[in-house]
Amino acid sequence: MKESIFSKKRILLLGSGELGKELVIESKRLGLEVIAIDRYEKAPAMQVADYSRVIDMGDKNILKNVIKEFNPDYVVPEIEALSIEALKELEDEGFNIVPNARTVEITMNRDKIRDLASKDLKIKTAKFDYIFEFDDLEKKADEIGFPLLLKPLMSSSGKGQSLVETKNDLQNAWKQAQANSRGKVKGVIIEEFINFDFEFTLLTVRKENGENIFCLPIGHLQSNGDYQCSWQPLEIKDSLIIEAKRMTSRILNNLNGAGLYGVEFFIKGSEVIFSELSPRPHDTGMVTLVSQNINEFELHLRAFLDLPIPHIYLIEPSATRVILSNQEYLNPIYEGLNEALEFEKTKVLIFGKPVSRKGRRMGVVLSSNSDIYLARKNADEAARKIKVSTT
């Protein structure tokens, strides 16, 4: 009898948040062994993994040592705050970095992915520049014009991002970007504010053979760069989707690593404007847990494990709305679950984070309906029923 390819496969997950948790669950369904790594104990993915370890992932030697200790078949980054030098050296030594170390490096730094898209591939983006000293900021802000966006070169989930209305706001925005910057780079990206009509995510699966497979577009809303809600499918003109797919293919053909990518775009009139790219399951893609026949987490696994990916189709229009905490609690509890679960075709996912903070994402509501408007309405109303509290 032929041995299952999964009988000895081991995945090491770098970052163990809510997206990592869903990836671990899908991995366990395929019989894989998973090690979850993060910088704090009891992170969501650690609660369902086979093994876990708390380390400083930004320390090259510590990260290399723990990866060598567990000797995984695949190293799967879930966050940006880690030592890229360690990943590059380990890849040279024969470890499989998903999708590859170069892609992780390019996408974890806003300057590198913007340079690749705008300068190398001539893909339309917002006007931008990089600033490393505050004294240079005011002059560049005048060139780009107000309002504008200021972001750390390296951060995640919109942390440190500010909408700057006037010169008087530059100092506070600079301080916020510096305080929320991850890694050793303390520069910022100053970016034209685009008064877009809407924005969306195009989940794209890159197979080992170089084929790109596209999911239906996902609409989403953000606040200060952080995802608040999403829905699939998004009503959008075919011509705009064709252009977004063309842009995505050009970028992924350059990065060339198997896995799932979350590619974000702005739409302004007839223009498609590239925004950001993540080489892993995407926040907005949590809607696929109920909307698609194969969710984004399983798609990521199938892609880098080189497993078949049959036709991806919509089961039913669906929507999400995040559950946010309004203050800090240790071992938080959740009130209103009974009321939230009274909504038809609605699920609640509690991430299991051990500590809540003001504005921290603690869970998500998923709702389906043949009418996308009702799916969004039910997700919104159910989420409002849930309050993060403490005993």
From Swiss-Prot:
Listed binding positions for Mg(2+) are E264, E276
ATP-grasp domain: from which residue to which, for each copy?
A: 115-305
Q: Does the keyword RNA-binding apply?
A: no
Q: Which Pfam families match?
A: ATP-grasp (PF02222), PurT_C (PF21244), RS_preATP-grasp-like (PF22660)
Q: In which pathway does it act?
A: Purine metabolism; IMP biosynthesis via de novo pathway; N(2)-formyl-N(1)-(5-phospho-D-ribosyl)glycinamide from N(1)-(5-phospho-D-ribosyl)glycinamide (formate route): step 1/1
InterPro entries reported in the protein's UniProt record: ATP-grasp (IPR011761), ATP-grasp_carboxylate-amine (IPR003135), ATP_grasp_subdomain_1 (IPR013815), PreATP-grasp_dom_sf (IPR016185), PurT (IPR005862), PurT/PurK_preATP-grasp (IPR054350), PurT_C (IPR048740), Rudment_hybrid_motif (IPR011054)
| Metal-binding among keywords | yes
Q: What is its EC number?
A: 6.3.1.21
- Residue positions binding N(1)-(5-phospho-beta-D-ribosyl)glycinamide: E18, L19, E78, D283, K353, R360, R361
Keyword list (alphabetical) reads: ATP-binding, Ligase, Magnesium, Metal-binding, Nucleotide-binding, Purine biosynthesis
Q: How does it assemble?
A: Homodimer.
Family note: Belongs to the PurK/PurT family.
Specify the protein name: Formate-dependent phosphoribosylglycinamide formyltransferase
Native organism:
Prochlorococcus marinus (strain MIT 9301)
Gene that encodes the chain: purT
